[in-house]
Amino acid sequence: MNYTTQMDAARKGIITKEMEIVSQKEQVDVNELRELIANGQVVIPANKNHKSLSAEGVGKNLRTKINVNLGISRDCKDIEKELEKVRVAIDMKAEAIMDLSNYGKTREFREKVVEMSPAMIGSVPMYDAVGYLEKELKDITEEEFLNVIRQHAIDGVDFITIHAGLTRSVCQKIKNHERLTHIVSRGGSLLFAWMELNNKENPIYTNFDKILDICEEYDVTLSLGDACRPGCIKDSTDGVQIQELVVLGELTKRAWERNVQVMIEGPGHMAIDEIEANVVLEKRLCHGAPFYVLGPLVTDIAPGYDHITSAIGGALACAKGVDFLCYVTPAEHLRLPNLDDMKEGIIAAKIAAHAGDIAKNVKGAREWDNKMSKARADLDWCEMFRLAIDPEKAKRYRDESTPTHEDSCTMCGKMCSMRTVKKILNNEELNLI
């Protein structure tokens, strides 16, 4: 193999098997796709050691992808329960799964996830450094942080979140700034604490070139995390957030010089009127790199319903150019999600992604809706269920309330508008009584 990474291959004019797979899935010209990868506007996270991967592309002119978070923790360390979540995520066709494990047999779990998953796998090595090493945060060395990152790469993780933009100068602004929620990124807060406890610069920032060595060797995509993402709408689009984004833009260029693929992570909590400006800022400051957002959640008052607040923001964000959505479940801010929460979160994220794809005129997006509309006009219930984003729920709802006439539902019965117009146009007897 005479290339190191997907970006290196693209710049050398080589079309990889992963590019061919993505081209077929997306119905886009493979040479146009290669050009987008070469200039950093599309990434194909594909670790050389992830043998079960079915490659996906993230970025310009492609379908918006969704990610599912899971993993073992001190309070919920049942590996089998989390592996069942992996199976559900795969069955529901999530394109990415992030293992956020931070306690116990993290490597054993990670290896199983990579082995069984055709979805691209992401991780946050910072979490693992604390849980796996079983050391006090202050005592973890820079070399140990790098060793954990290398282990994740060896194990086949396709993309890693690192909070390299949280520099000492950014931290100083956080300390001087009147933020309501300070740092809500778990990895970011751990790094902030390490820096303060050791009175040192961010080790992920100072060792960035060594991390690029690892990513280049295994073709790991960098997901540059936003440690300073807003945790409430009051903190959104402030100086702290933007200062970190500027640093991420600089790091993006450094990664590209080494042919390492990059995504940029984004908010977070954000009022709906600020979403478009934030997408424009990321695309400008980070040179068109794919944008990966958590939400954004457009209001802070809805615990138990944050899959909805997230879907509202996510749909608008995608419409304005976001490329990748991290799902949010009804359990957000409350507890670890269970399987039902997961399913709700996946469906909400998929709806938001699809709504955004319609606005972006992504190939095939509108056709799906048109087929559903045709099935409704024809009162073809079997076809409606087949096309539904959640066929199981749609069929269950209909079965729970069976109409007298099979060509209608219990909302309108014989007064169904589709039924009425269809009968009139076909010169059939109407019979509303």
Curated annotation (Swiss-Prot):
**Which Gene Ontology cellular component terms are annotated?**
cytosol
Read off the InterPro entries from this record: ThiC (IPR037509), ThiC/Bza_core_dom (IPR038521), ThiC/BzaA/B (IPR002817)
Keywords of this entry: 4Fe-4S, Iron, Iron-sulfur, Lyase, Metal-binding, S-adenosyl-L-methionine, Thiamine biosynthesis, Zinc
Residues that coordinate or bind substrate = 69, 98, 127, 163, 185-187, 226-229, 265, 292
Pathway(s) where this gene product acts: Cofactor biosynthesis; thiamine diphosphate biosynthesis
Name listed for the protein in its UniProt record: Phosphomethylpyrimidine synthase
Q: Which cofactor does it need?
A: [4Fe-4S] cluster
Which terms does the record give in the GO molecular function aspect? Answer: 4 iron, 4 sulfur cluster binding; carbon-carbon lyase activity; zinc ion binding
Domain of life (superkingdom):
Bacteria
| Reactions that this protein is recorded to catalyse | 5-amino-1-(5-phospho-beta-D-ribosyl)imidazole + S-adenosyl-L-methionine = 4-amino-2-methyl-5-(phosphooxymethyl)pyrimidine + CO + 5'-deoxyadenosine + formate + L-methionine + 3 H(+)
Give its E.C. classification number.
Answer: 4.1.99.17
Q: Which GO terms describe its biological process?
A: thiamine biosynthetic process; thiamine diphosphate biosynthetic process
Source species, please?
Clostridioides difficile (strain 630) (Peptoclostridium difficile)
Instruction: Write out the function statement from the record.
Output: Catalyzes the synthesis of the hydroxymethylpyrimidine phosphate (HMP-P) moiety of thiamine from aminoimidazole ribotide (AIR) in a radical S-adenosyl-L-methionine (SAM)-dependent reaction.
Alphabetized Pfam families for the sequence: ThiC_Rad_SAM
What positions does the entry give for Zn(2+) binding? Answer: 269, 333
Taxonomy, top ranks, is: Bacteria, Bacillati, Bacillota, Clostridia, Peptostreptococcales
- Cite the binding residues for [4Fe-4S] cluster: 409, 412, 416
Q: Which family does it belong to?
A: Belongs to the ThiC family.
How many and how are cofactors bound here? Binds 1 [4Fe-4S] cluster per subunit. The cluster is coordinated with 3 cysteines and an exchangeable S-adenosyl-L-methionine.
